[in-house]
Amino acid sequence: MHLFSKSILPALGLCLLTVAPLRADVNSDLAFSNFNNVDLNALADGSILQVRGGLVYFQRGIITQSLYMVDATPSEVAAKLVHWNPADHSKLQVWIHKKLPANPKPSDFADLASLPNNSSVKFLRDATAKFDPKAPSIQVSKEEAQLLAASASQSGDAQNRFVTVWSQILAGRFTDFLNGHFSSESYAGQGGEIRSLDEIKSLIHSDPKVYIQFQRLFNQTPIRAAGASKSLPANLYYQSFDIQGSSTLVDGAIYQASNGPSIQSVDIDFYINYGVFATLELEEMWPVTVNGKTKTLVWRDDLVSAPSIAYLHGTERLASGLIMLQDVKANIEAFRSEFK
């Protein structure tokens, strides 16, 4: 937990930076989080506050929380979360990030052909070309394994086969996610079959206060509880990024809704074909005023389920959390630079 009480003075001490919430008490808004006694003056100066999430009883889970301010309105920040392209920031090692239509088809993944020729992507191409269903190095279902095995047995251009088979798999995952079949989606993982929905539900239930805060939004997405309301419109994308020197392919969906004076957002990476089982990124955005101008206070929660985390204990698990905090901070800095 971080406690900030120092006021920030502008250069030359010309005036005191004044920050005022548009509601009665920002700290009461943050009561569900791991932050309290937050000094908005420090955040208005560009600081990013970060803490590890609460105690996670889910063995494969790790969670971090961040708090920062953006020089824009909440609606502008929410829109940027949907439309920004992390691939424009080389430090993040995102090779491709593409928006998708409401019902993606295999033809919408043609940009897979534009993945860079680097060692990270080479891992993914080689794992596809040499796929062995008896010893898979990438995370796929039994049916998807058959597609990959058939592709690997074919002759012809390896690049075309790579694009064709992954276009089919990624589009198929979106179809199931959007049409009520997400609960049955799975893939072979260490220790047996892994169901993406189970991983996501374990993550979101790890912190009861955060779950209650976002329950209404969760229940308007495909991860909703049984009998919950219909899903909100989804902002869909796919991407490829580096995980410890190896590339992964990801299907993701962003859902947003107002929550009184704030806006909530959940970004669900519901299919990841290597290294990680599932991730979620939660944001809540409130308006604040700084010297008479509206800015946005952003609370962010990053939740990750990965096979390697289950084997970490003590200082190793702590170190993993610290590395994750650094990665999240780099992502926030890149995102915030889009407003300059």
Model-predicted segments: where are they?
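Bacterial N-terminal signal peptides
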Residues: 10-19
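Sec/Tat signal peptide C-region and signal peptidase I cleavage site
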Residues: 20-24
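Bacterial N-terminal signal peptides that target proteins for export
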Residues: 1-10
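Polar helix-capping/helix-linker motif
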Residues: 5, 19, 83-86
